[in-house]
Each structure stands twice: as structure tokens, then as C-alpha cells.
């Protein structure tokens, strides 16, 4: 069938083929793809809802992120009431200060009018973006949110193929694209999405899979920032990769 598992399988095969090509050429994939830069702005994905985790614990987590070198951090919203989540945003901004970028991710939790309410209340906290406010297929609702707030809207982790991203762009439903090459069709399709984004003056901030996406976002001129998960999110994740990515002064460097 279309999309779903089929496209994810294609993604895995395509990624493996690019890995083989890099090994044969004795070059890192980011250089095979153009090698625009060897370091990328990076944010730590954090601020998850957890049992027993209140505002005090959230504040401590943000402090830890900054101490380990983060210049940008992201937290979850959408599981609590709008006012409760605004309080979470406020606490994070107070802890990290004004020089650290702050993003929020709703994981499709809101209806469009709820997302607009949240965004308007959150604007004073200078958010770098508001991620996935509504269901992935609600291009019309998301476009209305985009028009209703000064906060850039980011989305795309649940989108498949360049045609899905084309539809999102044509609806003016997004300001920052978040493709995931493990989902949308692999490295080859990811690069086509990046070219499409560039032709529409949009930046790329890939979703997850930092060990893969460091190569892709390093290869393009419109790569905005890389998502980075600490070991506390999944202690086993970093152990399956030969090259551990280290966050330093807000950047991650592409491995050679």
C-alpha cells in the first residue's frame, strides 16, 4: 500500500544503500551529499510528562540541559490544560534565560482553535517554534494557526514522500519542515524534500534519529537545527552507533 509500513521499509533500504556507498567511497554520507558544513546547531528534546515530575523537576531538567551545553531546548505541551502548560513554558523560560531558544511540541494534541489559544498565550515567551499543534492531515486547520500567531509552526515528522510535503507547503500550513528520513522514504527522498523546501524559502529541522540526520542536515544550505536526545530518554539508543554524537556549545559535529 501507500505510505505507512511500506514507505518505512523503503526508507530503511535506501538508508542502508547510502551507508554502503559511503563505505565504498571512504567518505561520510554528508560529504557524498554535498558537505555544506561539518557542524550543526542542535537542540535537546526534553520536558516530557512523567509521573511525579512537577515544575521544580522540570526546571532542574532545563538547568541540566543548559549545563551540558544546550543553546536550544524543547518541551512537551498538550497533555495538560492550556494554562498549566503555559505555566510550564514560563518556568522554562525563566530558568534558561532569554539567550537560549525554547520550542514546544504538542504531538498533535490540539484542535486548531485550542492551538491558537495556546499560541497567543505563549507568544510573550519568545518561542522558537510551536511543533505539530494539530493532526498531521489537518492542513487547513494548521494553516489557520500559522496565520494566527507570530510563533513559527513546525511540522512534518508524520509526513510521507515529497508529495506530502508539497501539499503541506501549498496549504501554507508550515514555517519549518521536520522530515524524518526513517519514515518519509529514506535519504534520497529526504534530499528531494530539502530541495522543495529551499525553493519555497523554508528551513529543515529533521525529526529524531540524530545519528542519521546529522549527515543530512550538514549537507544542505537550508538546514536549521538538529534534534538531540539525551541518554536519559533511551539509554540503549546511543549504544548501537559506532560514532557517539557529542553536544558542545550548542553544536553537534558530523562524524568523518
Features from the language model and the residues they span:
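Short glycine/serine- and small hydrophobic-enriched flexible loop segments
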Residues: 19-23, 195-198, 215-218
